[in-house]
Amino acid sequence: THTDSSAASDVYKRQITGVIILFLLNTKGIIRELPPLTMPNTGNMGLPICLFAYGSQGLGVSAAISALIILCHFTLGVFLADRKFSLDVILKSPPFYAIIISVFLLYYDLELPGFVENTTFLLMYATIFLILMSLGIALTRLKVFSLNKAIFSSIGRVIIGPIIGYFLILYFNLEGFAAGVLLIQCSMPSAVLNYLVASIYSPKKIVDSVASTIVVSTLMSFITVPIVVFFALKYFN
């Protein structure tokens, strides 16, 4: 129909626009600095905060978002850092297989044995404390090299991020705890995993910039995240 053709044409235009933007950013050398802006810390910080805000139901949604972001780290993140795509990185990534198994179980509505499910839940809650400890250890090893640039990038991450999340909620017509979790996850600071990927695939100048953004955005999130959580609990509960 005419409507379907118009929708398909709109999708193609957006794809072409995205490719052009990536090409221009690549020629300017900015593309390697995008991961800290586009990939928040939905694991180390996002999971515990969503658990605190919405309980186990919020943890489930936040875990799904975190799994998607982790997959992006080993696909889009590597592509942006290295300027080329590598299938080997995905195949060597444990989260990739964990996501496949999860999707398989959900699609066929399969139930795990009771002892497996109970063990998984115990490990899940224990992991919450471990990832918070690992975040603290990782941050002590990072330093700020360019404060002005880091502040600018961090504002884009912790302030522009939740604004984009709010527009996503409106676009997908989300409500309740699902909308709140998405908003909270979008407000998280830059993920430490950005630094690990950059240290492997990017030059030292970019690595220093990524490290600075992670530290500054995490410090700024101590102020911004409580505000976002308050807003989420008030309007999406």
Predicted regions and their residues:
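Alpha-helical membrane-inserting segments
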Residues: 17, 21-26, 72, 76, ...
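Transmembrane helical segments that form the transport core of multi-pass membrane transport proteins
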Residues: 101-168
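The feature identifies polytopic integral membrane transport proteins across all domains of life
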Residues: 27-42, 57-65, 115, 147-154, ...
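Hydrophobic mid-bilayer segments of alpha-helices in multi-pass membrane transport proteins
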Residues: 64-67, 71-75, 92-104, 126-135
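Membrane-embedded alpha-helical segments of transport systems
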Residues: 13-17, 35-50, 61-80, 94, ...
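C-terminal ends of transmembrane helices
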Residues: 18-31, 74-86, 135-145, 194-201
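Helix-coil boundary and interhelical linker segments in multi-pass alpha-helical membrane proteins
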Residues: 5-6, 49-61, 110-114, 167-179, ...
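Single conserved hydrophobic/aromatic residue that forms the stacking wall/gate
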Residues: 1-12
